[in-house]
């Protein structure tokens, strides 16, 4: 299955994490509602929510990808260069989610403004992005794993994201900076990046793509050997640092749940 990007044991973990996302969405309402997942990927979370009785809708920028996801899952998946191009009705959704998507948007403020329009009064937005003011971002600087240039166009601290949401008419109801899915690994790969010449060696191992790629710098044997030698101690240090950073609200990932206020705050 070409849609599976990672090694099988990682794919199983991803499926479980998508179920956990569905759990977090389900807790926002007493009864299932209508959800839009912007940048829905393979539609794993939406499929699980559909199984639980939600009306699930997704978006992807690529028309071909949107069609393929829709064919595979049976979900309606819209495509367009911007969210506005999808032409959703005002107040159409109870919940809109963006999981590691907002940082890819050319105009995140306009995206949030459009979300405010299509969310019902009292509805929710869930946004998860890398945390620019995290310990791992500060430790990694230019080799921070989640920096991911040029794919990431913007980065936010927790306070910046909260302020931006408030300006577009959303009141924060929950915020935290620990992600079991992305936080410890992000710290681990960032620390390894400080040791190796080539970045993201471990991440490239875990993907199903070839380690040597025309689109990535070649792996040097010293980087491979250093990663193998250091992976266990660095992982232990990374987990400790990431858990500690989250205690001080400086974890690698920030997730905010916010409720629509009307009109703009």
Where are these regions (language model features)?
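Short acidic-aromatic active-site loops that bind/stabilize oxyanions
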Residues: 10-15, 226, 230
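Active-site hotspot residues in diverse enzymes, especially metal/ion-binding acidic/histidine motifs
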Residues: 1-8
